[in-house]
């Protein structure tokens, strides 16, 4: 069975510089292209090779072809925001947006996940961690695609709030993207190209978990995850934690292996 295709929004800029590694086909003209390319946003149009477009679609001529985007902003609005060049597989198109040219990568889900699990954490992480990450990320992604398909067919909006007598749950930014499925930055999932997937284990992980998702009955779980670079976990009931745990000296987590191993528990994902 073929994997579903996902449309990933990579960047929006007034000028987009990119390089074709291998041949790509400009579907409107049928021309085969390779090497350095550049497109500009002028008066609501895309200027490319001396012509005006509202949308341009490029298809790889070979599965081995890839394209490189120059100066992609990652970590947008975070303290570590920076720009870097990134390489991608699959097709891509340039679309006019309100603020510039929107670059969208069209790629199959499994190829997308190869980059995600290498970009969110590290391609050098343990195999079992990467397998769990692949299942969670695949579930979240397919839940978004399913939602977009459903909303595209019906006059309805995604439920953003759930309330009962005990709690109020609110989701933010669920309908931020209307011309692609997900974006490539922390707002959705980090998708930073094929260069980070350098460890052969990443390919093994995607192959071994291919098609595996989390479901609740007949519904794909909107399996959101969070991560941080430090701190100590705690039950969700306490609204905050004091600076130090009263009456305890606390554990020493200064070293890479200094955390105490807790009691074994059954796996939540298998």
Predicted features, each with a name:
Residues 1-270:
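Conserved, single-site charged/polar hotspot
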